[in-house]
C-alpha cells in the first residue's frame, strides 16, 4: 500500500525537474494514483502548467488501466505525460489502453494477470500507449 502523499510528492518532484530546464520531456509509468485520490487532490490537474497527461488529452472511451474488483471501479494507475509547449505532443487519436485476447481475462474486459507458469497475460494493469511527436 502506498499513501497518496507519496504520489503527490513524486508529482511535485516531476514538476521541479521539468521546471529546471527547457528541453522536451516524457514521463511515463505506473504512478499508482487512483481516480478517487486524483479527484480529491487534483493531482493531474495540478500538473497542467508543465505537462499534458495522456488520459486527459485522449482516450475518452477508455475506462482505465487497472480494475479494482472490490470497488468495481477502473483507474488510470498508469499514464504518459509529455512536456507542455516544448515541441513534443501526443497524437491524441493514438492514446489508448492496449487490450488484446492475450492480455484480457476471458470475456470480462479486465486485465489477465500474468501467470509465470503459462507465461500468459500481463501485469495487473493493461498497457497504456500513445504516439508522441517531436517538432
Show the residue positions of the predicted features.
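Soluble non-cytosolic domains of exported or imported proteins
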Residues: 1-9, 71-72, 120
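A long, amphipathic alpha-helix that forms part
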Residues: 3-23
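Metal-dependent phosphoester-hydrolase catalytic domains
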Residues: 17-26, 33-135
